[in-house]
Each structure stands twice: as C-alpha cells, then as structure tokens.
C-alpha cells in the first residue's frame, strides 16, 4: 500500500492511497468463490453455478463492496502511520476501481491542530471576591416584603408605589403598532418594568379618566422599528391599589416554611441560600475569567468541521428551548441563521481544544471524592437530598455531567495555581445582578 499526504489550506489534508491490484483481485476472487457456493440462479443447482457466470453477474457489485471496505481499513492504517487525527469525517473519492489496476482513492479532511499550551504566568488575571453582608440580608428581606404586600383598592390619584390596572394603546405617527396595546394590565408604579417615562406619566392619573402620554423608546431597544422612536400611549386606569408591607413577625417567617425561630431563623435561612448562590456565581465568573485569559494567550487554528458540528448542537439546543424536548429523532431542526451561533461555537471549540490539551499536559483526572462532594453539594439544596443523590448515581450520563463539572473546576484550580492573580472585591448585588442593557416592556 502506498500513501501520500498533501497539505492543502490551513488544517486541510489530502491523503492519496494506492492498494496493489493483486490484493484487490485476490479479495474479489475470494468473495466471488464464496458467493458461487451459495448463490441461487435459475437453471443451475445451488452451489453448481459456474464461476464465470457468477463473475459476470456479480463482479461489479462485489468489487464496489471490496472497495468500500478497503477504504475503511486502509485509510485507518494510513492515518495511524502518518499520525493524522481527523477533526471530522473524511470526504473520500475513489479514483480507480477498474480490474487489473491498483485501487486508488483520495481522502480530504481537516486534522486536529497540534500545539503546546502557553501557561498564564505573565500578565495577572483579575478574579473577584464577594461575601453576603447583614445589609444584603436586610435588603433581601425587604424585597420579600415588597413581593408579599397586601393590596387594597383606593380612589386617590396614582402615586409612586401604587399598583394599577390599565388599558393602553400605543401609536407611532397616529398609527397603532403591533404589541403596543393591552387590557387589564397590572403595573406597579416605580418598578421600572416599562420604558423610561411610561410609569412616571401615569402618576397623578385617576380611575376612568383617559389621558395620553408621550414617551421615547430607548435607542438600544430590542425592536429596531421602535428604537429611538417617540410614541403616544392612550391610557385608561381601571383600578388603583395601595400596598401595605407585612410585619416582620412569625407569621411572615411561616410564609417561607420557617416553623421555629421566627425572623432570625428566616434571616439565617436566607443568608445560607444567598451565600450558596453567591459562591456558585463567583466560581462561575472566576472560571470564565481564567478560561478567557487562557484563550487569549493560546491562539489555535480551529477546524471548520468542529465549528460546524458545534453550531448544529447549538441549533438543537435552541430548538429544545423554543419547542421543548418532545420531537421525533428524525424531525428536521429549523434552519436558524448560522451567524446566531458562530461566535459561541468558535469559543466552545477553542476552549474545548485547550481544555483537552491542558488535561493531558497536567494529567488531570476526575477525583471520585470531588465528584461525590459536588453531588452532596447539589443535594444539600433539596428537601430530599438522598433522592437527588440516587438520581445522579442511577445513570452514567448523569454522573458524566458531574464529572465534567468537576474537571472544569480542577482545570480552573490548576490554571489559577500557576497564574499570577489579583483580586477585586465586589458587593453581592453587583455580582448577582450585573447591569445589562435589558429590554423593557413598552407595550
């Protein structure tokens, strides 16, 4: 067998394999003889069909079968000998499968990039630290009180903090726009859930006294046809309600399943939950910072085949988020625009390549104790921790998910161990509620 390897553009390789005709003909003849012993053809007894008849009738199909199988066996051997690791399925084209000639074919594919990990030992990586303070707990208590206000109807003009039920319709240039109207819409004035100016415009309004307000949609509003535009909203207030904060007493604590200890037990429970969520978020943010820093100093050529595969995974994930998991295995996924997923796919592929190389270089293996500890940590947040443990341990797939998370933590820990680090203190709210240009409702 002769093998030649040609480097094409980037990671693409072209392998040409030539198998001697003697080997091909020997295999073809062997299969035809075996076929002659069992084939049934009209006019001949089973096993008595002349070889030349079998050959004339089945030679082409047997030759194609031999060619397919030889591609599988010889290509694997060629890749092994030349230390080539395909990043995707090779595109194979047979060049010659004629009798009496060597069997030749080409295989074109991308190879996995070969590189050495550059460690983070130069520029410092900034990580964050945070903790739950008494003030954070008090703020959370106040949020819970706000969420549990007792509302009663009033007749006075709307003031900040009131809840209103309104009918409204929005107009652009005196024409109604899609999604700009609602009936019986509940809104707490001052909640900031609507576009700037909308809630302020309702202050002072009275029941069943229609009025108009003019507001402008933010320049970065999610709907491009509305962004930056001035709109008029015709509003009718149907109901005004004033809220009363519940007292901080045992009755309030019992609403959150606190049976003993009253408000102090509630605060303790809230602090523990906040600390657990804060730790999870800080770990996630620091892990992302470490991984991003590792990617920034390790520039790797990414195989298009891996990016394409990851894009398909992301499309599938989006389909599940939009339409649920109940669908047939062969159901066609909508052709979402590729650009929606390309950057995320490239990041995942880049990080995956670095991750695999880092694990190999530092011989990192998922530690069973750490896997069990992570399961215990997950279980501690549930009312029936033993059931959650049993759920993870009942499936190799479930355990593999935890092992992957443990590996991520172990890799992040190792990167941090070798890197130059500096820390930035952040308060609870800045970590848990980072400011985003989120779209607010204006309909």
UniProtKB/Swiss-Prot annotation:
Species lineage: Bacteria, Pseudomonadati, Pseudomonadota, Gammaproteobacteria, Legionellales
Species, as recorded: Legionella pneumophila subsp. pneumophila (strain Philadelphia 1 / ATCC 33152 / DSM 7513)
Function recorded in the entry: Involved in protein export. Acts as a chaperone by maintaining the newly synthesized protein in an open conformation. Functions as a peptidyl-prolyl cis-trans isomerase.
Catalytic activity entry: [protein]-peptidylproline (omega=180) = [protein]-peptidylproline (omega=0)
Domain comment in the entry: Consists of 3 domains; the N-terminus binds the ribosome, the middle domain has PPIase activity, while the C-terminus has intrinsic chaperone activity on its own.
Coiled coil regions in record: none
Keywords of this entry: Cell cycle, Cell division, Chaperone, Cytoplasm, Isomerase, Rotamase
Family named by the database record: Belongs to the FKBP-type PPIase family. Tig subfamily.
Protein name, entry field: Trigger factor
UniProt key word Cytoplasm: yes
């Amino acid at each position: 067998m002769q093998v030649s390897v040609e480097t094409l553009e980037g990671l693409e390789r072209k392998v040409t394999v030539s198998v001697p005709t003697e080997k091909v003909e020997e295999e073809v003849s062997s299969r035809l003889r075996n076929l002659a012993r069992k084939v049934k053809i009209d006019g001949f007894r089973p096993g008595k069909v002349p070889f030349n008849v079998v050959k004339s009738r089945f030679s082409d199909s047997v030759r194609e079968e031999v060619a397919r199988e030889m591609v599988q066996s010889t290509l694997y051997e060629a890749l092994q000998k030349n230390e080539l690791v395909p990043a995707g399925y090779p595109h194979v084209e047979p060049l010659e499968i004629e009798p009496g000639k060597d069997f030749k074919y080409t295989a074109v594919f991308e190879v996995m990039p070969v590189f050495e990990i550059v460690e983070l030992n130069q520029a410092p990586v900034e990580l964050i630290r945070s903790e739950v303070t008494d003030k954070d707990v008090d703020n959370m208590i106040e949020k819970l009180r706000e969420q549990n206000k007792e509302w009663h109807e009033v007749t006075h003009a709307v003031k900040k903090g009131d809840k209103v039920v309104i009918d409204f319709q929005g107009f652009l240039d005196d024409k109604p726009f899609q999604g700009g109207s609602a009936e019986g819409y509940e809104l707490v004035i001052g909640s900031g859930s609507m576009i700037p100016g909308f809630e302020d415009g309702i202050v002072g309004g009275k029941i069943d006294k229609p009025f108009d307000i003019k507001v402008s949609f933010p320049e970065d509003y999610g709907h491009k046809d509305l962004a930056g535009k001035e709109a008029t909203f015709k509003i009718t207030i149907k109901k005004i309600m004033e809220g009363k904060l519940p007292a901080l007493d045992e009755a309030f604590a019992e609403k959150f399943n606190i049976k003993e200890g009253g408000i102090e037990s509630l605060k303790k429970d809230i602090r523990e939950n906040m600390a657990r969520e804060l730790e999870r978020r800080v770990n996630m943010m620091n892990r992302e910072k470490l991984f991003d820093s590792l990617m920034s100093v390790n520039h790797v050529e990414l195989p298009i085949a891996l990016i394409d595969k990851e894009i398909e995974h992301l499309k599938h994930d989006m389909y599940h988020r939009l339409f649920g998991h109940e669908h047939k295995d062969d159901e066609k996924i909508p052709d979402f625009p590729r650009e929606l997923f390309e950057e995320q796919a490239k990041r995942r592929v880049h990080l995956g390549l670095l991750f695999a190389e880092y694990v190999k270089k530092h011989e990192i293996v998922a530690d069973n104790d750490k896997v069990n500890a992570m399961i215990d940590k997950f279980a501690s947040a549930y009312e029936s921790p033993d059931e959650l443990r049993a759920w993870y341990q009942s499936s190799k797939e479930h355990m593999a998910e935890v092992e992957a998370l443990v590996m991520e933590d172990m890799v992040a820990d190792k990167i941090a161990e070798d890197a130059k680090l500096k820390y930035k203190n952040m308060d609870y709210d800045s970590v848990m509620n980072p400011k985003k240009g989120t779209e607010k409702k204006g309909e």
